[in-house]
Amino acid sequence: MNVHEFQAKGILSGFDVRVPKGVVVRSVEEVDSALGSLAAGIVAVKAQIHAGGRGKAGGVKIGKAREEVADLVKSMLGSVLVTHQTSAAGQKVHAVYLEEGVSIKKEYYLGAVVDRKAGMVSVIFSSEGGMDIEEVAHSRPEMVVVVNVDPVYGFLDFHGRKLCYGLGLKKEQVVQITAMARKVCRALMETDASQVEINPLVETTCGEFIALDAKMTFDDNGLFRRPEIVKLTDPHEYSEEELEAAKYGLSYIKLDGNIGCMVNGAGLAMATMDIVKYYGGEPANFLDVGGGASKDTVREAFKIILRSGVDGILVNIFGGIMRCDVIAAGIIESAKEIGVSVPMVVRLSGTNYKIGKEMLDASGLSIVTAENLDEAARFVVDLVGKRG
C-alpha cells in the first residue's frame, strides 16, 4: 500500500523527523486559508499522486504571490500526470500540497528498505539527492553507502558513522544524519512499512536537515494490525478493478496490455506475464487469486478481467493447496454465467490437473487447454493476434 507525500510526512513527523510545514488542499477555494497558516515567502506547490517523477511532469512548482499559487493549484487539480512510474494513461490529481519554502544548501538521499534476502533493514544514504537512487547507484556507485541493520538491535551509532564517513561528511553532519537515519529505521519497523524514502533530504543554509520529500510503502500483509495506516487509503489512486479485487482478497494491478492473466501465486503471476511478453503479447493485468481460491473467487476474478476490455485470457493455475478440478469447475461456471466471448487458454498443473483438464475439454466451451506454460503463452498470443 502506498500513501501520499503529505501522509508520509505526517507519519515521519510522528517519529520526530523534521519536515517543512505544509497544508493539503483539494480546491482552489481552500488556498487562502492554507496560505494563512504558512509563513510568508515562496511556497512549493506539489501535486499528490502515488508516483515519483512529479517534478519532470510538471507536478511540482514554486509560487510566491497568492494569485500565482492559486493559479498553480487550479492548473494541477484535475490534471493528469504521466511520469516514468505511472501507466501511459497517467494519474489524475485530486489533491495538492502547499509547503513552506526551504533555503537549500545541499541535497542528500536517505532511505530504508526491507532486505528479505538478508533478513535485515537496508539503510541507504547518498550525497546525490533529488535524483533516482537506482540511476546514481549505476552511474556513480561510490556516492551510495548501504548498511544492514538488524531489527532486533535497531540503528546504532556505528551504522551512522559508516554511512557518513563513507561520503566524507563532517562531525556535526554525522550527528544529525545518524539521528535522522535512526528515526527513519524506527518508522519503517514500527509501522510495518517495506520502504521509507526521503529524497531529497536537504541540509539548509542554517545547517539543519529536513525531509523535503517523503515516500512510504507498506506491506499489505501487515495492514490488519495497522488500522491507522489503512485509513490513509486514497480510493482515487486505484482503478475500479483494483478496488473491486480488494473486496474479494484478490491481488490485482491493472496494466496497459490486452491479455488478461489469472494466476495463483505472485511469483507464478510474474513469470506468466514475462512469458506472455516474450512471445509478443502484452499483459493487461497482474492478478493473483491466491492459494485458496474458490469457485466464487474465480467468478469475480473473471468479471474483473473482462471489465477492462481484454482481447484474450490466460489462466495459469498450479494446484498445490487448491485442486485443479475445483478451479476447472469455477472456470466453466463463470464462463457460462458471464458469457466469455474472447479467446481463453487454460493451463492446469498439480493436484487433480488431469481431471480438471478433462472437465474443460468436455465443457463444450471454446476453451483451449495447454500442457505447459510455454505452450499456453504461445496459444493465447496467437489467438489474440488472429482475432485482432
From Swiss-Prot:
Keyword Mitochondrion: no
Example GO molecular function: ATP binding
List of residues binding Mg(2+): N199, D213
Pathway: Carbohydrate metabolism; tricarboxylic acid cycle; succinate from succinyl-CoA (ligase route): step 1/1
Annotated binding of substrate, by residue: N264, G320, I321, M322
Cofactor: Mg(2+)
Keywords recorded for this protein, A-Z: ATP-binding, Ligase, Magnesium, Metal-binding, Nucleotide-binding, Tricarboxylic acid cycle
Reactions catalysed according to its record: succinate + ATP + CoA = succinyl-CoA + ADP + phosphate; GTP + succinate + CoA = succinyl-CoA + GDP + phosphate
Cellular compartments per GO CC: cytosol; succinate-CoA ligase complex
Domain ATP-grasp, chain residue ranges per copy: 9-244
InterPro entries: ATP-grasp_succ-CoA_synth-type, ATP_grasp_subdomain_1, Succ-CoA_synthase_bsu_CS, SUCC_ACL_C, Succ_CoA_ligase-like_bsu, Succinyl-CoA_synth-like
Binding-site list for ATP: K46, G53, R54, G55, E99, V102, E107
Name of the protein: Succinate--CoA ligase [ADP-forming] subunit beta
Natural source organism: Anaplasma phagocytophilum (strain HZ)
Gene: sucC
